[in-house]
A protein has these predicted regions:
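Charged phosphotransfer/docking patches of two-component systems
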Residues: 10-14, 86
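Charged docking surfaces used in two-component/phosphorelay signaling
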Residues: 14-18, 22
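A generic structural motif
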Residues: 24-30
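CheY-like receiver
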Residues: 49-107
Length: 109
């Protein structure tokens, strides 16, 4: 399974990669992106991954803007420190909403 990580905090992205390697070794992270604009460009230029892990607050805006620019068919797991966006997240392809800091136990459930 191919996954894309959209996360502007380097430490959080590295933590998520480590958790995925431990909890779901069959998931291969194809890229890690840090901004809305970079993500839009990547999604337009590449085949969609099987799964997206997406932070909501990115340096250049909120990641919901990506859905306005690109049709995303893959399921999305939002990873954020803010719980107030849960309803908005489930209006798009969200299958889960994980609050930071992440740990491996969250991915097992």
């Amino acid at each position: 399974m191919k996954a894309l990580i959209i996360e502007d905090e380097t430490a959080a992205a590295l933590n998520l990669k480590a958790i995925l390697k431990q909890a779901a070794p069959d998931i291969r992270v194809v890229d890690t992106l840090e901004s809305v604009e970079e993500s839009i460009g990547w999604l337009r230029a590449n085949p969609q991954p099987d799964l997206l892990f997406m932070d909501i607050h990115l340096a250049d805006g909120d990641s919901f803007r990506i859905f306005d620019a690109v049709e995303i068919a893959a399921p999305v797991i939002f990873t954020t420190a803010y719980d107030q966006y849960a309803l908005e997240a489930f209006k798009v392809n969200s299958i889960d909403y994980l609050l930071k800091p992440l740990n491996a136990c969250l991915l097992y459930t």
